[in-house]
Amino acid sequence: NQNYKLRTHVSFLPSKNEYQNFGIMQAMDILNAIFYIKENSPFKLMGGGIRTILFGNSYGGYLANLCAKIAPWSIDFILDNSSFVNLFGNIFRLIGFGKEIDFTRYHGTYDDTLFKNIFLYLSDKTYWNNNKFSKKYFSNARKIIREPLNKEHLIIQSLYPNPKYILYHSIFDERSPFENKENFVHILKELNFKV
């Protein structure tokens, strides 16, 4: 059958043997860059007090919110357009281990145009798995540390100087549910964040 497409899976292997840690290391990289810039020339020579504004769309907005969760005192403003604020639904597939369950449903992305008769499902290399007996198990603790929308964590975050938030999100967003962002904003306001 000339129209047949073989369904197969490929994992991306980064050149430095890294893995998709989904947010934590990227947020730490951003924060380390902010701390370095604030402590070194030419910004230090300017008398300090330079505002730190993080902005992003989708995953970039997620990283901005995650930076504010990790080090709220270091960020003055968050400008977020359509980020996700929790690992809702099957978004765990982006961490890479969804392929263990069913690579045709829980993949990072796919390509069905590169080859005529091959449908490629693609995932990142991952450190994590869904085996509860493994030291690499993606536990609830490892999940919630990556979620800006966690009320317990937001309560702790509210005890520190924290950023002002400007958040945009379409009610028609099919990738990241508007209701999640609405809940995030509600909790931020409840805890007296400036939104």
Regions found by a protein language model. Give the residues of each.
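Conserved aromatic-histidine-acidic binding/catalytic patches
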Residues: E18-M25, G47-F55, H169-S176
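Serine-hydrolase catalytic core
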Residues: F103-V195
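Primarily recognizes the serine-hydrolase "nucleophile elbow" in alpha/beta-hydrolase
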Residues: Y36-I101
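N-terminal start-of-chain detector that recognizes signal peptides
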Residues: N3, I50-I53, K136-N140
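A short linear-motif detector with a strong N-terminal bias
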Residues: I30, N57-Y59, K143-E147
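Short, hydrophobic alpha-helix immediately C-terminal to the catalytic nucleophile
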Residues: L31, N65-K69, E182
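Alpha/beta-hydrolase active-site loop
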Residues: Q2-K44
